[in-house]
């Protein structure tokens, strides 16, 4: 135990962090980070994620604006648990800011422990203080633990609930006077939110299905059931919950994924049903009452699509989760949509759609609402995504929050041979290969996923002439899988048609078996994707190792596959392993000349994807000495 100045002793304070350290210290510029956790369902003083306060460097952030924007992102079950000042020594001030923004978020002071931190710009050193309750003095943290396996702590005892609700609300407005339309709309939304606990409303609770046709546990809860659910707080012991109350764990199989990915997200599904024939305990005669309208009125249909996620413990009673998480979450989303719609009630109504994401570097899901009227490339939507990238501390040169990046809650999920477009091609085959053998080298690899295209795919016999086409298809698949493009990977004929359309080839080229090279590939990428390319010319295969440093920089900054063309052969380069001191290097080659079945083991063992040295241990040259080579380095588009 640690002694205080007055001689009393206090217990040591442990702070557990699930988020990466760089999310708190990088970039090293003056800023404020909000810390997120789940005080109700995770161990006390646990930080699961960090969000950046906007704009950067603001000494006095607009707390009301911050609270409103965080409300739209935050999944119910997570909460603000602290703040960190980067470039300031005032950890206590950060803690008080966190308390203030949290109060604006929920309308009450936090009863759970709060964290304050400060980061020294020069050293990156972080100092934390904690207050274990409102009004409790902040004390220095005595132990900080950065979890090695944060996903396990988050999901071993945690789970998601998802509720979708389509609403078509009738808004009646006097035909000759729309001055009161906003008040009527607000009243309509508030009335809708209040009805979520009505006796005639039922909640169908279903467990996730991992395969089509698989049975799953399900129950139905009624509004009356929810009104009688007692307030249940986290106490660290599941035994104190009523044993007769169905817990969330009942809806999941004994073995379930302990991670959350875009391709496969498991959640308890909640469907809201309205039982208009609900039996009343009091018998009554059917009656009709007539209310004459004072003036002519028009009907405006307000279409809303609600879609919320909630985080809870698997031991938490599902009825309590619906009552205390799902219904407040739906009410929150209604309120957010109300503010977005009200200014356009008399014009074209926004088409608001919520989506859920777990972008790279973030362990917990976030929700954002997009207006899909004009598509994703519309300027306002692009600016919204850019601000989200800044707040979530995501890079600004790649699309990570587009609709195609959203979590997929469909039955099943994907495996190594399935892509979002339904492709059955092998993906990311290099992940199974052994080390390169370069001593002390630094490995620089492709960033993202790709599909392996090789000879004889799609029923096309291109053996002997189609290797560059296959390399181009692999590169095109990378842009598609990283969400830069939604167009299909082109066939040989479609590639030839592009080259004819731009005037590079004569019409007789279409349907031929003529080779293409790096320059033709650059033309096609520019035409179909608007992608620019850098070309490196090498006079001989012997000189390729001299380009390893430049290639390493490419993979670190661009991360795209590289096409290598020399003589009549073409390869796809996925990375390099380079020792700058010794000059020793190896090239990670994906060979399109493979003609067999898509058998991963056969491909790896046969060397069709593997590390190649310019000269191997037996003195044989992989690259031809008497041929010049062109290296095509496609650039990553700067977009979100």
Curated annotation (Swiss-Prot):
Would the keyword Cell division turn up in this protein's UniProt record? no
Question: Record's InterPro entries?
Answer: Papain-like_cys_pep_sf, UfSP1/2_DUB_cat, UfSP2-like_N
* Gene3D superfamilies (UniProt xref): 3.90.70.130
Q: Which residues does the entry assign to the active site, renumbered to this chain?
A: 467, 591, 593
State if Transmembrane is listed as a keyword.
no
UniProt cross-references to Pfam families, sorted A to Z: Peptidase_C78, UfSP2_N
Supply the EC number(s). Answer: 3.4.22.-
Alphabetized UniProt keyword annotations: Hydrolase, Protease, Thiol protease, Ubl conjugation pathway
Gene Ontology molecular functions:
deUFMylase activity
Where does the record place a coiled coil? none
Q: Where is the signal peptide?
A: none
The record's top EC class is hydrolase
GO process terms (BP) = proteolysis
User: What function is annotated for this protein?
Assistant: Thiol protease which recognizes and hydrolyzes the peptide bond at the C-terminal Gly of ufm-1, a ubiquitin-like modifier protein bound to a number of target proteins.
Q: Which family does it belong to?
A: Belongs to the peptidase C78 family.
- Protein name as catalogued: Probable Ufm1-specific protease
Q: Which organism is it from?
A: Oryza sativa subsp. japonica (Rice)
């Amino acid at each position: 135990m640690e002694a205080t100045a007055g001689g009393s002793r206090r217990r040591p304070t442990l702070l557990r962090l699930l988020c990466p350290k760089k999310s708190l210290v990088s970039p090293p510029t003056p800023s404020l980070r909000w810390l997120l956790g789940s005080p109700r369902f995770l161990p006390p003083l646990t930080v699961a994620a960090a969000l950046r306060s906007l704009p950067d460097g603001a000494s006095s952030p607009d707390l009301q604006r911050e609270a409103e924007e965080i409300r739209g992102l935050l999944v119910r079950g997570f909460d603000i648990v602290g703040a960190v000042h980067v470039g300031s020594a005032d950890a206590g001030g950060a803690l008080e800011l966190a308390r203030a923004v949290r109060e604006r978020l929920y309308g009450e002071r936090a009863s759970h422990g709060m964290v304050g931190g400060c980061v020294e710009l020069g050293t990156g050193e972080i100092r934390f203080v904690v207050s274990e309750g409102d009004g409790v003095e902040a004390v220095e943290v005595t132990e900080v633990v950065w979890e090695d396996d944060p996903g396990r702590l988050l999901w071993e005892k945690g789970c998601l609930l998802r509720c979708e609700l389509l609403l078509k609300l009738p808004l009646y407005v006097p035909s000759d006077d729309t001055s009161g339309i906003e008040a009527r709309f607000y009243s309509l939304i508030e009335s809708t939110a209040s009805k979520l606990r009505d006796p005639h409303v039922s909640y169908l609770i279903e467990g996730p299905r991992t395969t089509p046709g698989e049975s799953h546990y399900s129950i139905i809860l009624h509004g009356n059931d929810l009104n009688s659910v007692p307030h249940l707080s986290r106490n660290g012991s599941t035994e104190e919950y009523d044993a007769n109350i169905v817990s969330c764990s009942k809806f999941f199989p004994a073995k379930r994924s302990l991670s959350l990915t875009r391709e496969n997200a498991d959640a308890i599904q909640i469907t809201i049903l309205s039982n208009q024939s609900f039996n009343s305990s009091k018998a009554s005669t059917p009656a009709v009452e007539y209310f004459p309208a004072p003036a002519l009125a028009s009907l405006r249909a307000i279409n809303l699509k609600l879609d919320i996620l909630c985080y809870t413990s698997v031991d938490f009673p599902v009825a309590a989760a619906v009552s205390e998480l799902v219904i407040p979450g739906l009410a929150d989303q209604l309120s957010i949509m109300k503010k977005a719609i009200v200014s356009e009630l008399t014009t074209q109504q926004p088409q608001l759609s919520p989506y859920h994401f777990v972008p790279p570097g973030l362990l917990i899901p976030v929700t954002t609402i997009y207006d899909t009227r004009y598509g994703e490339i519309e300027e306002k939507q692009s600016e919204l995504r850019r601000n989200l990238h800044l707040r979530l501390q995501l890079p600004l040169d790649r699309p990570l929050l587009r609709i195609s990046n959203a979590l997929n809650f469909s039955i099943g999920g994907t495996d190594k041979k399935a892509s979002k477009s339904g492709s059955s091609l092998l993906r990311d085959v290099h992940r199974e290969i052994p080390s390169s053998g370069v001593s002390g080298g630094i490995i620089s690899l492709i960033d993202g996923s790709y599909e392996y295209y090789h000879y004889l795919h799609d029923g096309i016999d291109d053996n002997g002439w189609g290797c560059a086409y296959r390399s181009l298809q692999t590169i095109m698949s990378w842009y598609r899988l990283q969400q830069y493009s939604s167009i299909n990977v082109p066939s040989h004929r479609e590639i030839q048609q592009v080259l004819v359309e731009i005037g590079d080839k004569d019409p007789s080229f279409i349907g031929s078996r003529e080779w293409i090279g790096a320059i033709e590939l650059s033309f096609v990428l520019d035409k179909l994707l608007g992608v620019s390319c850098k070309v490196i010319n090498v006079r001989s295969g012997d000189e390729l190792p001299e380009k390893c440093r430049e290639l390493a920089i490419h993979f670190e900054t661009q991360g795209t596959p590289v096409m290598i063309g020399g003589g009549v052969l073409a390869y796809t380069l996925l990375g390099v392993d380079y020792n700058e001191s010794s000059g020793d290097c190896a090239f990670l080659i994906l060979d399109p000349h493979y003609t067999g079945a898509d058998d991963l083991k056969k491909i790896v063992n046969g060397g069709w994807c593997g590390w190649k040295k310019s000269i191997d241990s037996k003195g044989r040259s992989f690259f031809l000495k008497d041929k010049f080579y062109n290296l095509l380095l496609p650039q990553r588009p700067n977009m979100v």
